[in-house]
Amino acid sequence: MSLSMRDPVIPGTSMAYHPFLPHRAPDFAMSAVLGHQPPFFPALTLPPNGAAALSLPGALAKPIMDQLVGAAETGIPFSSLGPQAHLRPLKTMEPEEDVEDDPKVHLEAKELWDQFHKRGTEMVITKSGRRMFPPFKVRCSGLDKKAKYILLMDIIAADDCRYKFHNSRWMVAGKADPEMPKRMYIHPDSPATGEQWMSKVVTFHKLKLTNNISDKHGFTLAFPSDHATWQGNYSFGTQTILNSMHKYQPRFHIVRANDILKLPYSTFRTYLFPETEFIAVTAYQNDKITQLKIDNNPFAKGFRDTGNGRREKRKQLTLQSMRVFEERHKKETSDESSSEQAAFNCFAQASSPAVSIVGTSNLKDLCPSEAESDAEAESKEEHGPEACDAAKISTTTAEEPGRDKGSPATRAQLFPAEPSRARDTARLDKASPDSRHSPATISSSTRVPGADERRSPGREGPVATKVDEARAIPAKDAFAPLSVQTDATAHLAQGPLPGLGFAPGLAGQQFFNGHPLFLHPGQFAMGGAFSSMAAGMGPLLATVSGASTGVSGLESTAMASAAAAQGLSGASAATLPFHLQQHVLASQGLAMSPFGSLFPYPYTYMAAAAAASTAAASSSVHRHPFLNLNSMRPRLRYSPYSIPVPVPDSSSLLATALPSMASAAGPLDGKAAALAASPASVAVDSGSELNSRSSTLSSGSVSLSPKLCSEKEAATSELQSIQRLVSGLEAKPDRSCSGSP
């Protein structure tokens, strides 16, 4: 039997020089007497007064222990043995052979610990204390069911180094700082029987890690200098004091004792689990560890996609605004379907998470990530184009510096382009699978004959800066074809616009070949038309001049911002309520025909052409996922009229899948009526032309259903009223031009 002794034992060789005096018991400590065998006491034990009251004919074994216990119970003053005697409660001196145990400890959640250990486990320490994750949990076995045990854990330094996280890995950064005060954590259920400990998982989840040296949680016990594990004073509490950027190793201890105060005199069984090693940090360094903790910690829900963290709140706000946008659109379309027989479908049913809804009146781009805030979107507008996941957009403006040198710097060329320069060719190509363009990308370019820009009337503020930026772009190409490149229907269905589809026969067709675009730059200065572009690519505001035959025009379903109703242009607007006619101002009052609820090319294709005169490179128009503008044509003339388009009989018609579209007048009445009920989608022939100057309405007006054909006269009168409403817009550019420096 071997017991831990505090006082040093005098070797037997030195004892020969000290005569034994039975009446001078204080010469020997009680621990020395009890710890040694009979070389000195063959048949005598030490009574308190030196007399041989307790005798044992043999070695000092269990009988003498029993006698000592009996003596203690009868009140023998052991203090008389001398001041050096360090007496422990005698019941703890019972031989351990009576209790048979072989404790075994198994670490819980070992797989999770292994995952953290592979990446380099980090534990955050704070001044107030932070719990560990994964929590330290073990399962014990092999304990004596009747004996009582105290279970503890402490955290020790794994080495004498200080670490730093550099180049995605931990490396030694120097020698360790001075060690913090020792602190052990006693399981709050201690002491308990072995049966109780083995019936449950022993968890130390309440242990907290802190870097606060002045932490006062706990109490202190003095361990004897000859203790097998520790010497000196140890504090016990709920918080362990650690140094940041140091590596630590948790330890688990089992002590068979029925009183915590007996810990310094008890035998500790210590267990180490290398996978629980960690580095203490004040903030997580490795993103992989952060994500692993978020994924596995049930208390980290605030950082998850489904939680209420800061990032998730931005996502939820985006999704909420998308829902509001869709609900508003559904309401508007349902209101219009009563009079138009559901002729107009939304271009953008914003169902892709990459589409960010911006509910403000400012012109904003699609955010690259759904969690991007509005402020970030605005900042990106100021710092140039950013690559969106949905598309890659770039805009350049080719100018002729020699043109119009005598004109004022802010004057724009808004007159009809010459026929040789008024040709904008649009080509609908089937992009190769390895194309650099994303599923639906429009690359377009036009020639810019003049370098001067004009500020749009009434909205000079947000446009003026963009005009200056556009003027700073050097000229590159004198002429570049304006082409529309799109992927096949299957690719488009997987892109940001799941509903966008093209008829197979449209591949390689030419669109609006050589037509000047009748647009007013004012509508690009954050009017109602463009406000929702970032919000799902819905507001399709740009229009080409409509056709009185009602077939080759395009529908302008420009969804305005919060307060604006869905507006339709051209003769179709004549059938709408007056509040919808007001919105026609943003879409120029030009007739647009729906194309199978969507368009073979985005409206913003034409929007960007007009936007070049005022928005140019820095405008968020050019970063729309459907735009890739190489140069722009500022020679655009605003016209509130529907422009007749003579379409050859041999040409295919830009038709729609609407079953109720018919034509009121024109050379193709019969063919248009026949195509009205056909879902087939065909393309406008490249030979069709738009007359750039048309001061009068043609004999027929566009109508979208046979029911509306009889309302030509009403439509004509309504269009005339619209003409009067917008007639002042042509005069405003002159006034703004004269007032500008």
Swiss-Prot record:
Disruption phenotype: Conditional knockdown targeted mainly to lung mesenchyme causes lung hypoplasia at 18.5 dpc. Conditional knockdown targeted mainly to the otic epithelium disrupts inner ear morphogenesis, which is exacerbated by simultaneous conditional knockdown of TBX2. Simultaneous conditional knockdown of TBX2 and TBX3 targeted mainly to lung mesenchyme causes severe bleeding from 10.5 dpc and embryos die shortly thereafter, perhaps as a result of knockdown in the developing heart. GO terms for biological process: animal organ morphogenesis; anterior/posterior axis specification, embryo; atrioventricular bundle cell differentiation; atrioventricular canal development; atrioventricular canal morphogenesis; blood vessel development; branching involved in mammary gland duct morphogenesis; cardiac epithelial to mesenchymal transition. Interacts with PML. In adults, highest levels in lung. Also found in brain, heart, kidney, liver and ovary. The modification Phosphoserine is found at residues 369, 432, 438, 456, 705, 736, 738, 740. Its main location: nucleus. Residues 107-220, 241-305 bind DNA. InterPro entries: p53-like_TF_DNA-bd_sf (IPR008967), T-box_DNA-bd (IPR046360), T-box_sf (IPR036960), TBX2/3_TAD (IPR022582), TBX2_3_RD (IPR048387), TF_T-box (IPR001699), TF_T-box_CS (IPR018186). Keywords: Developmental protein, DNA-binding, Nucleus, Phosphoprotein, Repressor, Transcription, Transcription regulation. Pfam families: T-box (PF00907), TBX2-3_RD (PF20627), TBX2-3_TAD (PF12598). Residues 438-447 have a biased composition (Polar residues). The gene is Tbx3. Coiled coil: none annotated. One of its GO terms (molecular function) is DNA-binding transcription activator activity, RNA polymerase II-specific. Signal peptide: none annotated. This is T-box transcription factor TBX3. The keyword Nucleus applies. Transcriptional repressor involved in developmental processes. Binds to the palindromic T site 5'-TTCACACCTAGGTGTGAA-3' DNA sequence, or a half-site, which are present in the regulatory region of several genes. Probably plays a role in limb pattern formation. Required for mammary placode induction, and maintenance of the mammary buds during development. Involved in branching morphogenesis in both developing lungs and adult mammary glands, via negative modulation of target genes; acting redundantly with TBX2. It is found in: Nucleus. Residues 369-469 are annotated as: Disordered. Residues 377-386, 420-437 have a biased composition (Basic and acidic residues). GO terms for cellular component: cilium; nucleus.
